Regions:
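Acidic (Asp/Glu)-rich catalytic clusters
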Residues: 25, 48-57, 92-105, 140-144, ...
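Conserved, mostly hydrophobic/aromatic
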Residues: 32, 61, 98, 139, ...
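Exposed aromatic-hydrophobic patches
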Residues: 396-403
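Boundary/entry segment of secreted carbohydrate-active catalytic domains
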Residues: 24-60, 64-66
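Noncatalytic carbohydrate-binding groove/subsite architecture in carbohydrate-active enzymes
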Residues: 43-47, 128-129, 133, 165-290
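Substrate-binding cleft and catalytic face of glycoside hydrolase catalytic domains
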Residues: 56-200, 228-230
Length: 427
């Protein structure tokens, strides 16, 4: 009965996603996370990295502040960011630069110092329920302009939390941090969960984790999920497993329904890590560079249409050097620009098609305010303009109905950026 009910809820949510109803997240922000690239480069110049983010049109950056890095020794006054035991020097420069560039920041707190957990590694739970709360308070005082926070990362897998219990996560980490962050700044918004898309052999599924948090009376403003694809052939809107307990972008309606069921409609949804590895070089669920670019636009549209989704964060700006790890960036590890770079800055996707009438959606992300754009169609081997220059909405979005049959190739031109979107092939 539960599976049938979930299926009914899923179909209802899918209909809402397709229709783009009034509850769609039209105010959604799109961001990136790439801690290593932001902190160390290349390029060596932090200013150049900020310029790259501006060229991409990034609204927000997610960054992990490692508790064990800032507080390798126990502070005498843990709620005071100026306590001599705290060392914020790794994070101060880049966070201040992001603030000066008017790029919002989401801080994720992770990594227990050994003095909090009996000498274990950073993925072991601290023994004192007040410890993370005190650090969270200090972090908020250090960076008062930052008002969005997540507590831990993928605690449902042992790589990031031992023991991976939703009850202990809620009572020892989330709730103390939530109370402390609200005390430090009432404007702070705090997300819990930050779960991986599926359980590992020793882990907990995101569905079971959400329900365990509800039982433990979790305090949260938003539920955060990392909805990576987990199956070959999975796209942002198809190929996911509806009867399984995993949650990916393809099964996003499951997350929407589960969060509503357990925490109510006032709880928002943050999609805090997402991306597709490109191959070559990746061999793990990798897709071609062109398909990666297409999925960037399709994922942006899916999140835009989803109710209560406020954030979609792309994981990596630059591929990791080790091809067996993450290659989901907009640059290769050698610095070559991939098609996904322009696909992120100018996302473009198909909403629907009825005969030759095709509805397309997109966004011009760099800068703020209404942006000029033009559409092109490939005809007889040549790109032809579709009408004249138009303006996006004040938040950069466009939605057009064009005459385009299946197989037609379309793209967006941004005259201010002097570049094209990825090519959209009508399906």
């Amino acid at each position: 009965m539960r599976i049938r009910l979930a299926a009914i809820i899923g179909v209802s949510c899918l209909a809402l996603l397709a229709s783009g109803g009034v509850s769609a997240s039209s105010h959604i922000q799109y961001g990136v996370q790439d801690d290593a690239w932001l902190l160390y480069g290349p390029p060596a110049s932090p200013a150049a990295r900020i310029q790259t983010l501006q060229r991409l049109g990034v609204d927000l950056v997610r960054m992990t502040v490692r508790w064990d890095t800032v507080a390798s020794k126990a502070p005498a006054d843990p709620r005071n960011p100026a306590d001599p035991a705290y060392d914020w020097s790794l994070y101060d420069p880049i966070l201040q630069r992001l603030h000066a560039a008017h790029i919002d920041v989401l801080l994720s707190l992770w990594g227990a110092p050994s003095w909090t957990n009996g000498g274990h590694g950073p993925n072991y739970l601290p023994k004192d329920a007040a410890a993370l709360g005190s650090f969270a308070y200090a972090a908020s005082q250090r960076y008062p302009w930052i008002t969005r926070w997540t507590v831990w990362n993928e605690p449902n897998v042992r790589l990031f939390l031992i023991p991976n219990s939703p009850t202990l996560y809620t009572t020892r980490l989330l709730n103390p941090a939530y109370r402390a962050l609200k005390s430090a700044n009432p404007r702070n918004l705090v997300a819990g969960g930050v779960t991986s898309p599926r359980k590992t052999p020793s882990g907990v599924s995101p569905i079971a984790w959400i329900r365990g948090m509800r039982t433990a009376r979790a305090l949260l403003d938003a539920y955060a999920q990392n909805p990576y694809p987990v199956r070959p052939g999975e796209t942002p809107s198809s190929g996911g497993c509806w009867r399984c307990t995993e949650i990916t972008m393809a099964t996003l309606p499951k997350l929407i329904a589960e969060v509503k069921r357990d925490f109510g409609t006032r709880t928002r949804i943050w999609l805090t890590e997402y991306g597709y590895n490109s191959k070559p070089p990746s061999r793990w669920l990798g897709v071609s560079n062109l398909l990666q670019a297409r999925f960037v636009g399709e994922a942006a549209l899916r999140a835009y249409l989803a109710p209560r989704v406020d954030l979609l964060i792309h994981f990596l700006v630059r591929d990791e050097p080790n091809a067996s790890r993450w290659t989901s960036g907009f640059y290769t590890s050698r610095g070559k620009v991939k098609p996904s770079f322009n696909a992120y800055a100018l996302p473009f996707a198909q909403v629907s098609r009825r005969g030759n009438r095709t509805t397309v959606w997109g966004q011009v992300r760099p800068r703020t305010g209404a942006q000029p754009y033009r559409l092109q169609r490939l005809r007889a081997g040549h790109w032809r303009w579709i009408g004249g220059t138009r303006l996006t909405t004040r938040t950069g979005y466009l939605r057009r109905v064009v005459t385009a049959a299946r197989g037609t190739q379309l793209r967006v031109w941004s005259p201010r950026d002097r570049r094209y979107s990825a090519v959209l092939i009508v399906r």
